[in-house]
Amino acid sequence: FIGSALKVLAGVLPSIVSWVKQ
């Protein structure tokens, strides 16, 4: 469970970072 959650987080993180830096 933790591993899949980290995978999802790692996949979403770049989008969040780019949205914050917008």
UniProtKB/Swiss-Prot annotation:
Expressed by the skin dorsal glands. It is found in: Secreted. GO terms for cellular component: extracellular region. Keywords: Amidation, Amphibian defense peptide, Secreted. GO terms for biological process: defense response. The modification Glutamine amide is found at residue 22. It comes from the Eukaryota. GO terms for molecular function: protein kinase inhibitor activity. The keyword Transit peptide does not apply. The keyword Secreted applies. Its main location: secreted. Pfam families: Melittin. This is Melittin-like peptide. It comes from Rana temporaria (European common frog).
